[in-house]
Amino acid sequence: MGSAEGSKLAINKMLIFQVIGIIALLSIPSLLYTGSYIISEAPAPKEGIEQAPSSEERLSEGLLFIVLDGGRKDMMRDSNFMPNLNSMVDENGTFIDVLTGPLTMTASCVKEMATGIPSRPKEGLSNFHPEHPGTPDGWTLASSYDGDGDGIADNEFAIVGDYVWGDLYADNDEINFMKHRHGHSDYMKGDIESFETLNSWFDGEIPKSNTKEDVTFERLPNVIVAHLSGLDSTGHRYGTTDSPEYEEKLRWLDEKFTEVFAKVPENWTVVLTADHGLTESGQHGSSDAVIREVGAWAWGPHIKKSHTVEQIDQRDLATLPSLLLSLPLPHATHGKFPLDALDISDEEKQELNQWNWNATVMRNQWMEDNGHNYVEGLSSEVIEWEKISPEKMGL
């Protein structure tokens, strides 16, 4: 090799390294942003609530919120598998299409339904033991809010079933958590125990807490979250479509719920949903449509009959305690009321929509004040939901 060729090769190598160096430098901001996004939580105000328009007039006197872990929408909606559940909404209630976030892990889905705050990738690292962000949410307020000032919370909140919800609110001794989950191969035992606890409550009995032995709960709950995970375990083991085991589990759940539903007071609202769906082989975690698209079956006072609501975001379900029980609406909740499900006057809908929007405007203001992404020009005078998107709200 001549000296000229050697010099040319050296120059080419130098140019290559320079290009690589420039690309690396240009990538640093993106890598820092992406890394921060992955390991951090979505920004949300740790305080701030919007009072209900009328705390004395509530849409419901109680709320039974049921989550079937790993419930496929198409199979749950099939009356061959869950005839009793579907008859409740086909005749007396509303079916709602629900879209989960892209991270379809149990903890991330539960956290969105509970807090209304969108999940970040870090939630996947703590799939079975989510951490509460420390923000106000409707379920926390259901356990503690004393609107009439008599020194006693207006509602009594209890959780039964899987430990995911219990772990999320582990630091709240006002919540009676009855844990009924015995590992990932628990196809039946935990669900059987959960139904026993549910029936006890509706029969007027209060079993001793099996997670807070030093706390005595004397009031029957009128706000209940029941998270049953046996269906998810069954799907993981046996698959879903064309799986006799998964199909039989759906039928068993449908029969057990029929007994419970008959005991729910008429002035309560019942909402049954799934945290995520499952693929044919029983998997979840990805953003496949069959996993993200779940359903919600709802009935009770002021709920439309024989009605279907177009798709809502899963975190919209976090607004239900505030909406139905006239609890304050936290500014931190990234949720929109599913008003189309309600059988109320247009004037009442407008009032509730304004309440919801006011909380959104306050959250947007907090985003701006604290250096996060926000939407310019929002005001309480003009309701502009179309301007709100995850990309523009600091997610």
Name the predicted role of every residue range.
Residues 69, 88, 113, 226, ...:
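Structural scaffold positions in well-ordered secondary structure
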Residues 2-59, 135-138, 162-170, 247, ...:
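Membrane-interface soluble catalytic domains
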Residues 5, 11-19, 51-59, 188-216, ...:
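A long, amphipathic alpha-helix that forms part
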Residues 71-72, 229-231, 276-278, 302:
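Catalytic metal-binding/acid-base residues of hydrolase active sites
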Residues 218-232, 292:
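Short coil-to-beta-strand
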